[in-house]
């Protein structure tokens, strides 16, 4: 087996496109559709593979920024501190695996949820506004990441994912 993931994906896409597709019953529309979706998904994965680490880091940075804003503007701290420290450490560790970055981001989102449940109810509107504003970057990055899937109604309005993960914080 070839160890290069890009080459492996190319080989699988070629095999599915040239060999498997000819064996799929042309009258089986569902099978034909699923094969084409699978090939397209693999192609999308192949194009995104080199950017995966930057993408995960950008989402983790977005979560960290959101948590810091919540802590600062709600005046309540404590519930976010450890998860924020974990994400900060993940973002400074050059050897950390993508999965660990994503896990630390997920734990921070859980801590954000817990924080929101515990804040004073009078801060609800402030917290809502912080979350909405703080989520825009991640939403835009995720839309750009998946734009090639073909489900985005306004794909031409979505910036290229490479542009959205090229900031110094996400290198």
What are these regions, as identified by a protein language model?
Residues 1, 37, 55-62, 76-79, ...:
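Non-membrane alpha-helical secondary structure
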Residues 1-13:
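Acidic, low-complexity proline/glycine-rich segments
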Residues 10-71:
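N-terminal interaction modules that seed assembly of large macromolecular complexes
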Residues 19-22, 26, 48, 70-76, ...:
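Surface-exposed polar/charged interaction patches
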Residues 54, 64-89:
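Structured domain cores in non-transmembrane regions
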Residues 80-143:
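Amphipathic protein-protein interaction modules
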Residues 123-171:
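Glycine-rich, aromatic-bearing surface loops/beta-hairpins
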């Amino acid at each position: 087996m070839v160890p290069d993931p890009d080459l492996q994906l190319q080989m699988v896409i070629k095999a599915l496109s040239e060999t498997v597709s000819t064996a799929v019953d042309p009258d089986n529309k569902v099978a034909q559709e699923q094969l084409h979706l699978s090939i397209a998904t693999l192609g999308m994965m192949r194009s995104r593979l080199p950017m995966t680490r930057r993408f995960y880091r950008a989402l983790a940075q977005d979560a960290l920024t959101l948590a810091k804003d919540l802590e600062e503007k709600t005046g309540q701290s404590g519930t976010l501190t450890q998860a924020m420290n974990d994400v900060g450490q993940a973002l400074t560790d050059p050897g950390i695996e993508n999965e660990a970055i994503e896990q630390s981001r997920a734990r921070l989102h859980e801590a954000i949820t817990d924080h929101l449940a515990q804040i004073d109810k009078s801060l609800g509107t402030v917290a809502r506004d912080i979350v909405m504003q703080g989520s825009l970057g991640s939403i835009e990055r995720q839309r750009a990441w998946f734009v090639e899937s073909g489900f985005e109604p306004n794909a031409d309005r979505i910036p290229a994912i490479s542009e959205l993960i090229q900031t110094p914080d996400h290198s």
